[in-house]
């Protein structure tokens, strides 16, 4: 795709593409964790109420602590920061509040549809059952949708229930997801440490979901390479790949005699590209966790643009807004600055995401129409 001149957005001023504020554009968020999307001020307030020790003495400093602690270069160290957010997410009231604020923050960022993923099994220390936790989150989502609507911003948010790869409750979580399929839950996920905990450990749960025709998006290709993605597709029947950035390891760059550069596809990469299997790329998070270390340490080294130019179905996501101190607007702005994308490129990313949602086809088509209309304006 040809590149056109784009104004370079600034994190200190309104991020722009051309003369259009990126925040004003309709967006779709596919990969956004509830326990990574809290406001630092909310964590600070709730932790004080619960006497949870804090590493900072004010909300701003706490936000800086999350970002710095999550930027150590490995997924394991990135995940260590979640002990603090999880500590304040063990009651129905807190879960409802956090989910409501989560939706409000998405709406303020121009998101018109989002899928929030989280692991109910990590929210039972205060005595909640997993089903009670799911209902508390759903209550908060609906409150957030109503508040956004009153403020003039229509938004819909669905839940994706996550099971932890290192635990043994995936079948229980899978059945819970199916039980709530008419009450806000649209998908299932596996998250947590990727190395040493393959998708195949959860074959029973994933077979159950396949039998129920229930959509699956699995974390893969983040801390491990192409074999993890292969496992997600074959064992997990995944319809989307959470991150999936390391699919680029199945591509080989070849210089020809006339100094042209060509790319040779491995079988897996060609399958993912040709079948248009969506990749839930999260640029800032990928840099923090070291998922892109094989290519470099800056955004310009991220294989996002390579995958996009080669025709992969790329989508742009935040992963964990608190840990990455980011928003979808900021992620898109950084891509515009780095790769000189224009309005057409940003629209394509949103259309990819809209088509990849776990909504019924009629609602996906409505979402695509809303995006097209919004970008045309």
Residue ranges and their predicted role:
Residues 219:
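Short HxH-centered metal-ligating active-site micro-motif
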Residues 2-4, 12-214, 222-240, 246-377:
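Metal-cofactor-binding active-site regions of metalloenzymes
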């Amino acid at each position: 795709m040809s590149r056109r001149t784009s104004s370079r957005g600034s994190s200190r001023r309104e991020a722009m593409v051309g003369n259009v504020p990126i925040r004003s554009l309709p967006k779709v968020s596919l990969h956004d964790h509830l326990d990574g999307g809290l406001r630092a001020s909310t964590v600070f307030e709730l932790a004080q109420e619960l006497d949870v020790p804090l590493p900072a003495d004010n909300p701003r400093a706490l936000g800086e602590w999350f970002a710095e602690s999550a930027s150590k270069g490995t997924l394991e160290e990135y995940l260590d920061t979640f002990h603090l957010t999880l500590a304040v997410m063990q009651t129905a009231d807190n879960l409802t509040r956090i989910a409501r604020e989560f939706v409000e923050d998405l709406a303020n960022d121009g998101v018109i549809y989002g899928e929030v993923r989280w692991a109910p099994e990590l929210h039972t220390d205060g005595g909640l059952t997993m089903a009670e936790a799911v209902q508390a989150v759903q209550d908060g989502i609906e409150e957030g949708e109503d508040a956004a609507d009153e403020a003039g911003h229509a938004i819909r948010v669905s839940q994706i229930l996550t099971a932890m790869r290192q635990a043994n409750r995936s079948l229980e979580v899978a059945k819970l997801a199916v039980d709530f399929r008419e009450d806000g839950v649209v998908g299932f996920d596996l998250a947590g440490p990727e190395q040493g905990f393959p998708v195949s450990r959860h074959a029973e749960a994933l077979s159950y979901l396949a039998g129920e025709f229930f959509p699956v998006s699995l974390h893969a290709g983040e801390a491990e390479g192409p074999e993890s993605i292969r496992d997600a597709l074959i064992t997990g029947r995944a319809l989307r790949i959470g991150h999936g950035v390391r699919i680029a390891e199945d591509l080989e760059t070849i210089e020809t005699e006339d100094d042209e550069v060509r790319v040779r596809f491995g079988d897996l990469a060609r399958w993912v590209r040709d079948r248009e299997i969506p990749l839930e790329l999260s640029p800032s998070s990928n840099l923090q966790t070291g998922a892109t270390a094989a290519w470099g340490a800056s955004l310009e080294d991220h294989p996002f643009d390579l995958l996009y130019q080669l025709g992969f179905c790329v989508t742009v996501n935040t992963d964990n807004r608190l840990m990455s101190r980011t928003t979808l607007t900021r992620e898109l702005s950084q891509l515009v600055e780095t790769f000189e994308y224009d309005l057409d490129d940003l629209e394509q990313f949103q259309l990819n995401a809209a088509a990849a949602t776990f909504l019924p086809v009629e609602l996906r088509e409505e979402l695509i129409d809303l995006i097209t209309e919004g970008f045309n304006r």
